[in-house]
């Protein structure tokens, strides 16, 4: 069972009751606090599109505390972040691993942050296949293409050479917030607003 806090806001027309995520959305804040899957991707994409329609010139702030998840779902979020007119500022709180780190690095240049004790982890995509040998071969070729595409995007977002990214994502590669800044996944470590 998921517990969602509610906040009460005083307005000129009385009190208004919001779930916390709706209230944050009002301030152009999106919180990704779980695994990246089709459901969370649909919610984040919808919020990005909504906030762009509200004001295409104001930044959106995407807070990330995620262990990662599905590549296709993460790419749906990433592509939407690049597609909309608003700058999307990304802030890692806690953990941004795998697709969470990919989304963190995909924020607007100069607006990618992590809190001091956050942890960031990059690695190659994983998957599995079953069936006939031909089907397994097709799946293996597809995941290698996906790995190449993800590494190309990370290289572009970090300024690192493709070969460096490819080597550094062969295994789980954990970084502190400061190490992630030095690597180019984020622009700076922040301690306060």
From Swiss-Prot:
PROSITE patterns for the chain: CLP_PROTEASE_HIS (PS00382), CLP_PROTEASE_SER (PS00381)
Residues annotated as the enzyme's active site: 98 (nucleophile), 123
Signal peptide annotation: none
Annotated compartments: Cytoplasm
Oligomeric form and interacting partners: Fourteen ClpP subunits assemble into 2 heptameric rings which stack back to back to give a disk-like structure with a central cavity, resembling the structure of eukaryotic proteasomes.
The keyword Hydrolase appears for this protein: yes
GO-annotated molecular function: ATP-dependent peptidase activity; ATPase binding; serine-type endopeptidase activity
One Pfam family named in its UniProt record: CLP_protease
BP term (GO), one: protein quality control for misfolded or incompletely synthesized proteins
Natural source organism: Agathobacter rectalis (strain ATCC 33656 / DSM 3377 / JCM 17463 / KCTC 5835 / VPI 0990)
InterPro entries, A to Z: ClpP (IPR001907), ClpP/crotonase-like_dom_sf (IPR029045), ClpP/TepA (IPR023562), ClpP_His_AS (IPR033135), ClpP_Ser_AS (IPR018215)
Protein name: ATP-dependent Clp protease proteolytic subunit
Catalyses which reaction(s): Hydrolysis of proteins to small peptides in the presence of ATP and magnesium. alpha-casein is the usual test substrate. In the absence of ATP, only oligopeptides shorter than five residues are hydrolyzed (such as succinyl-Leu-Tyr-|-NHMec, and Leu-Tyr-Leu-|-Tyr-Trp, in which cleavage of the -Tyr-|-Leu- and -Tyr-|-Trp bonds also occurs)
UniProt xrefs under NCBIfam families: clpP, PRK00277.1, PRK12553.1
Keywords: Cytoplasm, Hydrolase, Protease, Serine protease
EC number: 3.4.21.92
Top-level enzyme category: hydrolase
Family that this chain belongs to: Belongs to the peptidase S14 family.
Record SUPFAM superfamilies: ClpP/crotonase (SSF52096)
Top-rank lineage group of the source organism: Bacteria
Physiological role: Cleaves peptides in various proteins in a process that requires ATP hydrolysis. Has a chymotrypsin-like activity. Plays a major role in the degradation of misfolded proteins.
Coiled-coil annotated spans: none
Database matches in PANTHER family: ATP-DEPENDENT CLP PROTEASE PROTEOLYTIC SUBUNIT (PTHR10381:SF70)
GO cellular component: cytoplasm; endopeptidase Clp complex
């Amino acid at each position: 069972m998921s517990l969602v806090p509610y906040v009460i806001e005083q307005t000129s027309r009385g009190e208004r009751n919001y779930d916390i995520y709706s209230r944050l959305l009002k301030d152009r804040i999106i919180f990704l606090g779980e695994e990246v899957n089709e459901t969370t991707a649909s919610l984040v994409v919808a919020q990005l599109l909504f906030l762009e329609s509200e004001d295409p010139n104001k930044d959106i702030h995407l807070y990330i505390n995620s262990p990662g998840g599905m590549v296709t779902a993460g790419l749906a979020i990433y592509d939407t972040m690049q597609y909309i007119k608003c700058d999307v500022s990304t802030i890692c709180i806690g953990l941004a691993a795998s697709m969470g780190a990919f989304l963190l690095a995909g924020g607007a240049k100069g607006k990618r942050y992590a809190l001091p004790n956050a942890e960031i982890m990059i690695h190659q995509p994983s998957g599995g296949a079953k069936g006939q040998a031909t089907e397994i071969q097709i799946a293996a070729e597809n995941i290698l293409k996906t790995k190449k595409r993800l590494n190309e995007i990370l290289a572009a977002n970090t300024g690192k050479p493709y070969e460096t990214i490819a080597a550094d994502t062969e295994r789980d590669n954990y970084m502190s917030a400061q190490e992630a800044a030095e690597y180019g996944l984020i622009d700076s470590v922040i301690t306060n607003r």
